[in-house]
């Protein structure tokens, strides 16, 4: 089932690379991206857990480029819909969905096709069984990522390395949480903003 889901997600990513005009991140512009990622637990009682998730993002590039030297870039606010979130636990497999209403992203300004970024995000996750096992089926997610967009003629590919923490924030006891390191890939488009 996992391989089938991963194959379908990958095929959808490839099929979405249609002829939409590609631009760089611009102030007043927007980003739309379809992404998928996964990783493994890093420590503690949940170190043997693994995750796979896939979703879509819509973002608003809120600023013109500013900042000194290599830190110069544009600030973006985005939201993620996460219809696929799977947690592979030793006892069972959890299927869920989530929503990240807060994604804060800094797109560094470059003259090349490579646009590095850093990101902080937070959201909520609902699963069919408790995550971690014996805790809660409602959890909160926080993540930090470093990655890059690779700008093509029609689409922008992205890849990032992400640290994600999943926790019930005290809704249930115990609250061991799951800490994962993930790799995420995506395909998306930057749309020009409307200027008056």
Residues covered by each model-derived region:
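Short glycine/proline- and aromatic-enriched beta-strand/turn motifs that initiate or cap beta-hairpins
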Residues: 21-63, 180-196
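Predominantly the C-terminal beta-signal and adjacent terminal strand-loop region
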Residues: 23-28, 147-196
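Residues that define the transmembrane beta-barrel architecture of outer-membrane proteins
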Residues: 28-30, 48-54, 93-100, 114, ...
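Residues on the lipid-exposed face of transmembrane beta-strands in outer-membrane beta-barrel proteins
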Residues: 34-38, 54-60, 102-108, 120-124, ...
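Extracellular loop and loop/strand-boundary signature of outer-membrane beta-barrel proteins
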Residues: 42-44, 89-91, 128-134, 169-175
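Gram-negative (and chloroplast) outer-membrane scaffold detector with strong preference
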Residues: 52-128
């Amino acid at each position: 089932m996992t391989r089938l889901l991963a194959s379908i997600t990958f095929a959808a990513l490839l099929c979405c690379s249609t002829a939409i005009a590609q631009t760089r991140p611009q102030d007043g512009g927007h980003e739309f991206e379809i992404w998928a990622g996964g990783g493994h637990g890093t420590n503690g009682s949940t170190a043997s857990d693994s995750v796979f998730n896939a979703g879509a993002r819509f973002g608003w590039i809120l600023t013109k480029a500013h900042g000194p030297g290599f830190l110069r870039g544009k600030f973006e606010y985005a939201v993620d819909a996460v219809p696929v979130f799977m947690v592979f636990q030793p006892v069972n497999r959890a299927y869920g969905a989530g929503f990240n209403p807060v994604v804060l992203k800094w797109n560094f300004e470059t003259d090349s096709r490579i646009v590095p970024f850093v990101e902080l995000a937070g959201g909520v996750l609902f699963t069919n069984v408790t995550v971690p096992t014996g805790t809660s089926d409602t959890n909160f997610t926080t993540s930090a990522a470093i990655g890059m967009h690779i700008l093509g003629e029609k689409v922008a590919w992205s890849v990032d390395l992400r640290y994600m923490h999943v926790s019930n924030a005290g809704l249930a006891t115990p609250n061991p949480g799951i800490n994962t390191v993930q790799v995420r890939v995506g395909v998306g488009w930057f749309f020009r903003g409307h200027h008056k």
